[in-house]
Amino acid sequence: ISDFDEYEPLNDADNNEVLDF
């Protein structure tokens, strides 16, 4: 997840697609 810290994971539902959890 550290690699995705820039995207502020779990901050927005839209980020779900970017993080690909």
UniProtKB/Swiss-Prot annotation:
Region annotated Disordered, chain positions: 1-21
**UniProt superkingdom:** Eukaryota
What is the annotated role of this protein in its UniProt record?
Answer: Start or boost ecdysteroid synthesis in testis of larvae and pupae.
Protein name per UniProt: Testis ecdysiotropin peptide 1
| Source organism phylogeny | Eukaryota, Metazoa, Ecdysozoa, Arthropoda, Hexapoda
